[in-house]
Amino acid sequence: MAMGMIFVLTAVAQPIAHYHSRHIPAEHINDAIPFGLMCKTNLSYCIEPDKLADMKSWGVDTIELRLVWWALEKEKGVFDWLRLDRDVAKVEAGGLKVGLFTWFHIPPAWYEGETFRCIAHNQPSRTLSPWDPAALDVAERIYGATAARYGRRIDFVYVIGSADYGEPGFPHAVKHYKFSSPHSHKSIDWTGDRYARAAWAKISDVPLETVIAGKADRATALKYCDFYSDRSARYCAEVFAIARKKFPWARFGLPVGHHSEYPSGYNRAEVIKRLCEVSTNITVRWTDIGGFRDFSQSSVFARRVESACQFYGCAFGEETSHPLIFGEENLSNHASYELVANATEMLHNDYSCIRTAGDRNRLRMREFPRSAPVCDVAVLFPDIDEKLSAVARATSTGDRFTEDFVRKAGEFRKRSDYWICDTMMIKDGFLEKMGVKKVVALFPIPPETEKELAGFRARGGVVSDGDDFPPPPDPLVYRTVHRDFISEFCPSTGEIRFKRR
């Protein structure tokens, strides 16, 4: 691959600060399922001495060890630390830092607290309900016990959310773990437990069954989405506060995934906002680098998260579990520029994925300069439309609305760089703080968002559909202005260039 000269490595424009990988215990995985067997093969044997030596040579500095409450306390009041003791010692002996991927939202069989319960089938999941106050008591107790045992040996803590992968949101039908829920599916009707129902009854007289059947009025539909997304965000922040109290010296992270937001049970920007109200010492990681195998579309999700991170004040990171992303040269170029364009501070990749890459791609992640993007254009994330779409098809698994947004935003990225903001971010002052002069609406603007744009228009801000921007250059070159330099990516040649501002 042709590479332009990297000329700036100042205190401001540093390469990616941290490179992480992870380990999943074999005893957690249901290898009778093909995806489970793949996870076991790729992730359960990566902390043996030879593999740790490989990762250290590739620039990895931290190994995240998965710790699941389901396995840690199978007998009430009796913690089994044997496996984690062994794994921590292995990572330390390999000269890498120890991180924890804390899945304390998956209870052991004896636990009698509330879990998510779907309304459509009146069936529980095996994931703690964030509406149940006892869920925070669990976090307090298990984080406390873990910190007491390992202390400063733990350098990094990946804070739990409420979804299957420890992300914010609702269950999503994961089947490849031994603790996976027998009943699980993607929908927004996971508000059927008694605490969620009681919380909803305090703000609405409309039965939840009416809402998830798509029969509620517009105001109630929007209220319902705010109801569950707000709880998801606040739960993450409350758990983060507990983890910080127990591990005050540590670095922290939280994963955000799934292409859709409200259909998945949360709002990315709101999660970031609530976390930053606790502390900005956290890296929020988008979990699908290069997921569309094309920079213009894949970067939409990364920039959505990065925009909120820049605005609310925390660091941005990315991760992937795709074996080919950094192995195939063309995909590597697209994924690499996604990291550059979004000033990625922390990168995560699995051992097997890094191993499949050539030597150049293994090391290049730590070579790119990192500097925050600077932009005066913002694309509206159609959060109101996504809410209404989610409620209209509450028990559907389709993400067509999200796909339409990604397609349109991806096409517009060929013409201009941009931030991505939603109605809440505008209300919080995003456009003014980030120096936005032009807002691009790729869909009709709903009245709720139009109301928040009134001040922007009054200050002379321009709102357009994007057609007034110059057409894409030929040949296509993506351009990002950073605080310290300008970066460009030419997909036809694979060249990533850096220029002085």
Write out the residue ranges for each language-model feature.
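Carbohydrate-binding surfaces of carbohydrate-active enzymes
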Residues: T280-R501
